């Protein structure tokens, strides 16, 4: 008669509670357990839905109006979602009508603001619907604290990151901030990205931009994203540059911790 043994401790259990990443899913024979397989299929469906979800700017326009912020609704050169996904280059430029509309806005209200803010659906309108309003509030508060002037917020359907260069150039802004839905992941269909470019001009490459990514409830908080943005903007204006020459060195104090008394890190796979 064999002696019963205690099942081995699942060393990954604690990590599974800390991350939505697909780790230690287990197995059923040579495949995944049914629950894990169904969760994967659901996440994949949510990511696909986020890519194809139509951008609805009306709620954001209403919020901006309540805050006393002017907004302009524009469209990229990609006429629909199908063309947007097939022709990334069209998502980087305004349509002719949108460009003319923005020129008219500059002629009437004047240009030369410190900051132009662009909100574009990108590859996840869901991210914009959920998080753009809160990040715009962070940007407005930062601008008020620093004394920076703001151009009207431009809301762009079928837009990609580089479209901010054209918007910033037409508005004659010192810098442009683009809030855009990031490519959905299998655990993050609603991740918002923020891109900063100093002296925006059509033709800039990604090397001219700074990125703050994964802004969402389960990722980077609005407050921390605003803190990073404040540092990058102050340095961009001081040094008159952005992109690869500007590194994010914003302080990140660990609240409630005493570094002197912290225990040495241990291997979570080893027994207690």
Curated annotation (Swiss-Prot):
The cofactor(s) it depends on are: adenosylcob(III)alamin
GO terms classed as biological process: amino acid metabolic process; ethanolamine catabolic process
The entry's localization annotation reads: Bacterial microcompartment
According to its UniProt record, where is this protein mainly located?
other
Q: How is the cofactor bound?
A: Binds between the large and small subunits.
Of which family is this protein a member? Belongs to the EutC family.
Q: Please give the name of this protein.
A: Ethanolamine ammonia-lyase small subunit
Q: Which organism is it from?
A: Xanthomonas campestris pv. campestris (strain ATCC 33913 / DSM 3586 / NCPPB 528 / LMG 568 / P 25)
Q: Which gene encodes it?
A: eutC
